[in-house]
């Protein structure tokens, strides 16, 4: 099994000494979320928490990815941020590929390829030929619908394409702790997908607890979602 992975806690997820709940109480996350959905980067919506912006900077500095693949584009703010941060850290010819079923991007950037595609059918747009040509290290960011089926489809698609040392980050499992009833519609999709995926493929992955717990236990919007390929 993966490091930290094994039995079911009270919330029904399959994870041992790594409960998904964060040290930050739900009502405080609610207030943080109010700011997250108003956050912009270079005049584009950039819905990342302050914790995750800082955690991503640690990961980018350590991993030095040459390619970032983002599933879920929105207005392209995070894709642009990743491209800029890779450039700032001296990456040679940084590349970002951002896939969305309904892209609404109004700009172009030579470092970024915006592709139209379904998280449940990524092989149609991220072909074997394309994946084999990617320059490593690779960082994958799963930020699509936050529903279980899409999250699980993304994890399953990338599993055979990841090399040792590559990362895949499953975003927004924190929806399970936000108190607005609207978030119940996600049915804890990201966390359930991470738990089930690690139950099947756990020998091949490690939860990077140094990133998850940089500011306290799972003080991130991506609890137990920072996964490193062994």
Please state what every model-predicted region is:
Residues 1-230:
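A short alpha-helical cap/connector motif
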């Amino acid at each position: 099994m993966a490091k930290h992975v094994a039995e079911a806690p009270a919330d029904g997820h399959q994870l041992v000494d790594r409960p998904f709940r964060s040290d930050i109480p739900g009502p405080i996350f609610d207030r943080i979320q109010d700011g997250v959905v108003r956050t912009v980067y270079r005049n584009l919506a950039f819905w990342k928490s302050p914790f995750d912006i800082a955690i991503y900077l640690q990961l980018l500095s350590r991993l030095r990815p040459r390619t970032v693949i983002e599933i879920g584009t929105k207005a392209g703010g995070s894709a642009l941020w990743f491209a800029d941060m890779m450039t700032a850290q001296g990456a040679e010819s940084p590349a970002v590929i951002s896939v969305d079923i309904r892209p609404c991007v109004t700009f172009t950037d030579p470092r970024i390829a915006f592709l139209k595609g379904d998280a449940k059918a990524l092989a149609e747009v991220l072909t074997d030929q394309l994946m084999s040509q990617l320059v490593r290290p690779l960082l994958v960011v799963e930020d699509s619908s936050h529903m279980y089926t899409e999250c699980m489809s993304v994890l399953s698609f990338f599993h055979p394409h990841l090399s040792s040392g590559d990362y895949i980050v499953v975003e927004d499992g924190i929806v399970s702790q936000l108190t607005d009833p609207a978030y119940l519609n996600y049915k804890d999709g990201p966390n359930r997908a991470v738990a089930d995926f690690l139950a099947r493929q756990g020998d091949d992955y490690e939860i990077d607890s140094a990133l998850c717990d940089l500011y306290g236990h799972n003080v991130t919007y991506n609890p137990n979602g920072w996964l490193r390929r062994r």
